Amino acid sequence: MTSSTALASLSLAQPLFEAAATVAFALSGLIEAARKRLDAIGVVVVAGLAAFGGGTLRDILLDRRPFFWVQHATWLWVLLALCVAAMLFMRARHFALTERAMQWPDAVGLGLFCAGGTQIALAAQMPALVAVLMGVVTAVFGGVLRDIV
């Protein structure tokens, strides 16, 4: 497989990476916000920071406008629906908000955001080292924001 073929196949998978990573990090933000006993607005803010923070910083550093979540505003509705559904589920099921519950969505989001962020930087004609760094920034910055709040 040539590098252009590999890049093309990654481009086709990009929306799937973004979808799975965004949902996974939104869930990690939801769980962290619930562990801190934040109200509904706080839950949405923390979930949004986790889901969109790394990609937003990546877009700023790569000078991409509009930001991915502005360009695809459906993600905001997905985030709101996910927050409402998760809050209802956690309340009805008395879901245990353990550290272990945070590990799965966090790990999935890290891997997928790193792959997706790297691919976006490569598509923007960035050198390989810069692309890898953009992948790391995309993967970790949302979690950093989630943990700070």
Question: Which residues make up each language-model segment?
Answer:
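Cytoplasmic-side transmembrane-helix entry/capping segments in multi-pass membrane proteins
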Residues: 41-49, 72-77, 97-109, 131-134
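C-terminal ends of transmembrane helices
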Residues: 26-37, 59-60, 85-99, 144-149
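Juxtamembrane loop-transmembrane helix junctions in multi-pass integral membrane proteins
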Residues: 5-12, 16, 94-100
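The first (N-terminal) embedded transmembrane alpha-helix
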Residues: 15-28, 41, 46-49
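Short, structured motif recognition centered on aromatic/hydrophobic residues
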Residues: 45-49, 56-62, 133, 137, ...
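Helix-coil boundary and interhelical linker segments in multi-pass alpha-helical membrane proteins
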Residues: 1-13, 60-70, 116-130
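Structural signature of hydrophobic alpha-helical transmembrane segments
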Residues: 9-22, 67-81, 127-140
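Ordered, amphipathic secondary-structure segments that act as subunit-interaction surfaces
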Residues: 80-120
